[in-house]
A protein has these predicted regions:
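Flexible, acidic/Gly-rich N-terminal and inter-domain linker regions that tether
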Residues: 1-128, 132-178, 339, 520
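Conserved non-cysteine loop/helix-boundary elements of the Radical SAM core domain that shape
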Residues: 111-128, 148, 152-263, 267-324, ...
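Conserved active-site alpha-helix within GNAT-family acetyltransferase domains
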Residues: 488-507
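A conserved beta-strand-loop-helix scaffold within acyl/acetyltransferase catalytic domains
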Residues: 405-448
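Conserved acetyl-CoA-binding loop-helix of GNAT-fold acetyltransferases
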Residues: 456-475
Length: 633
């Protein structure tokens, strides 16, 4: 006979099948009643019920049973792993706990959930990943798409061999098998059951040089978290930070130019500052284009034993912000955040038992949100507007494509987003700077994670991502760029290949070609329904040779319109009634190619018109035959 817990689980599943349980409240009510009926001393977790549910029933019950749905509300499952205890190269900041002497990674107390998990697994990356994935699956989360976060102070200052070994072992754990090299592990992960769609490294601005950035990206990094703390050189020197704002500006620019997403850690309440000064420095983050991060984490200073700030506090030389002061300041800061920024965190994950002074409550984000709501001040950050977190589901049919343009670090950023009402369904970050290529630094579609290749997510796999990429390509071509590169997670490479991109590691790339100015020979009368001027689509196929040597016909986006005179469309003669010019969209693709022009005679500059026969092929041997698209008037 089944034990009481199994009977309870199967009764709940049957109640769901029959429709007697339809939401979380009714499920919890029935669960408590069954606990009493079966004389259980404690209430079994939802993970127990999930362990007995199978197939379609399990999938249908997930929204009711999943614990902490916010863990995957953004469309991916975050897996944080921590490096072994190691000190920062410059020493210790006045506020910083942890380090090798403390048996924890620098800047961590060792009591945070991720730190405890790391210690429990001997700081072994494979075991940490496997442990966290198992935890997520037990509480009902999908783990097809993993956002890998490498924590532990200053990862990029570690020995390069350790860095590569650590990352490889993370990929091995996701793949479920060992590889000889990191490259082999990455290649396996491109088609693995659990794919790494993004990878984050934590570091300092002064030890993330161009060489270190390139190494991190070769390992798979798509985002960096920089300990910025405050934009005040005197205060940074006072807390023995070891760098100033110049390093922050330099590092931010280097990261953006290479296509990384940039997250700043901001620490209100440092010695020597005040709420007013903190707010002034925070305002500078977005007023000055040398900064303007993509993401933020707020870490209001907490006094922890074993730090210099702790000694200052004991001596009466320093007092941290109290709860009311911190909540008011964070509300003021959140109200300033632009729509292209995502606030990742609002407080540290340090247990209250480890905090000697400062904020000890764990729901500061909710307290800040409540204060802003009471004051009628909305937060416009991405996280607060994500479709995956909204109780009122947006209407996909009413989604609008928006383009928020701003300058940052010597380049132009396009924050492209599909929004319905006040909700963000998905977005892309496109950067145009002095480099020859446009860079898609991020592509994101929100909602419950869809299984890879399936159409079972809230918003994923519904075409929003493809449309965002197409718009980014259009803007790139319009700006005169002939190439787009994407900062792609290892596990997303297959997706970009399906869009015509090729491997240009650490990027995925597509070569855009500007349309060719062409001419045709009029022949035959024009049908009466063809306008004298208008948009005509030519029947053009593309045979593509990519830099990686592969060939084949591909589907490509439409290029900027060019002027041609039409000889025939679809085999039927069609000419402008006045014999003048019309506009036509011409598909373009990547690499060296030839256009197979059907029923249209045209030639590129430098090609003899007699060599361009109707229905024939017009060769484009080099880029000299390409012209820049006309710029908007």
């Amino acid at each position: 006979m089944a034990d009481p817990e199994e009977r309870l689980a199967r009764d709940l599943i049957e109640a769901f099948r029959s429709g007697r349980v339809a939401d979380r409240d009714s499920l919890q009510e029935l669960k408590l009643r069954l606990c009493k009926e079966y004389s259980l001393d404690s209430v079994p977790p939802n993970s127990l019920v999930l362990s007995y549910a199978e197939g379609d029933v399990r999938e249908a019950m997930l929204p009711l049973l999943v614990k902490k749905p916010s863990r995957t509300a953004s469309g991916v499952a975050a897996v944080a792993v921590m490096t072994s205890p190691h000190d920062c190269p410059h020493g210790r900041c006045a506020f910083c706990p942890g380090g090798a002497a403390n048996g924890s990674a620098q800047s961590y107390t060792g009591k945070e959930p991720a730190a405890r998990r790391a210690a429990r697994n001997g700081f072994d990356p494979w075991r940490q990943v496997a442990d966290r994935v198992r935890q997520l699956e037990e509480i009902g989360h999908r783990t097809d798409k993993i956002d890998l976060i490498i924590m532990g102070g200053t990862f990029t200052s570690r020995d390069p061999e350790y860095q590569e070994w650590f990352v490889k072992r993370c990929f091995d754990a996701l793949n479920g098998e060992d590889s000889e090299t990191l490259g082999e592990a990455q290649a396996l992960n491109e088609r693995a059951r659990r794919r790494c769609v993004g990878m984050t490294v934590e570091t300092r601005p002064d030890v993330f040089t161009p060489e270190q950035i390139d190494r991190a990206m070769r390992m798979g990094a798509t985002r960096v978290e920089l300990g910025v703390q405050i934009l005040d050189d005197a205060i940074l020197a006072g807390v023995e930070r070891g760098h100033g704002t110049e390093e922050v500006r330099r590092c931010t620019r280097d990261c953006r130019e290479r296509g990384l997403k940039v997250c700043y850690h901001i620490m209100p309440g440092l010695p020597g500052s005040s709420p007013g000064h903190d707010l002034e420095c925070f305002r500078l983050l977005f007023d000055d284009p040398a900064y303007r991060p993509d993401m933020l984490k707020f870490y209001t200073l907490l006094v922890v034993e074993g730090t210099k700030v702790y000694d200052m506090w004991r001596a009466g030389e320093y007092a941290p912000y109290d709860e009311d002061t911190a909540v008011a300041l964070l509300a003021d800061m959140k109200a300033l955040v632009p729509e292209y920024v995502r606030i990742q965190r609002v407080q540290r994950d340090i247990p209250a038992t480890e905090i000697a002074a400062g904020i000890t409550k764990s729901n500061i984000r909710q307290m800040v949100a409540a204060r802003m709501a009471a004051e009628g001040r909305p937060c416009r950050c991405i996280r607060c507007r994500e479709a995956g977190r909204a109780e009122d589901a947006p209407d996909a049919g009413s989604a609008e494509l928006r383009d928020l343009v701003y300058e940052s670090c010597g380049g132009t950023e396009h924050f492209l987003s599909f929004e319905s009402g006040d909700r963000v369904i998905g977005y892309a970050r496109l950067r145009l700077d002095s480099g020859p290529a446009a860079t898609i630094r991020e592509l994101k579609v929100f909602g419950r994670p869809a299984s890879i290749g399936a159409d079972d997510g809230d918003w994923q796999h519904r075409g929003f991502g493809r449309r965002l990429v197409a718009e980014a390509e259009r803007l790139a071509l319009e700006s005169g760029r002939r190439r787009v590169r994407v900062t792609s997670g290892v596990g997303v490479r297959e997706y970009y290949r399906s869009l015509g991109y090729y491997d240009d590691l650490p990027y995925m790339a597509k070569d855009l070609r500007s349309p060719v100015e062409g001419h045709v020979v009029p022949a035959g009368p024009a049908p009466p329904d063809l306008p004298a001027q208008g948009l005509v689509r030519l029947h053009v196929g593309l045979r593509d040779r990519r830099p990686d040597g592969r060939e084949g016909r591909v589907e490509v986006a439409l290029a900027h319109p060019v002027r041609v005179r039409v000889l025939a469309v679809g085999g039927e003669p069609r000419l402008p009634a006045d014999g003048g010019q019309v506009r036509a969209d011409v598909p373009v693709g990547g690499g060296r190619h030839s256009l197979e022009v059907h029923a249209v005679e045209r030639h590129a500059p430098g090609v003899d018109p007699q060599d361009a026969e109707p229905g024939g092929r017009v060769g484009l041997p080099d880029e000299d035959h390409l012209v820049e698209p006309p710029r908007p008037q």
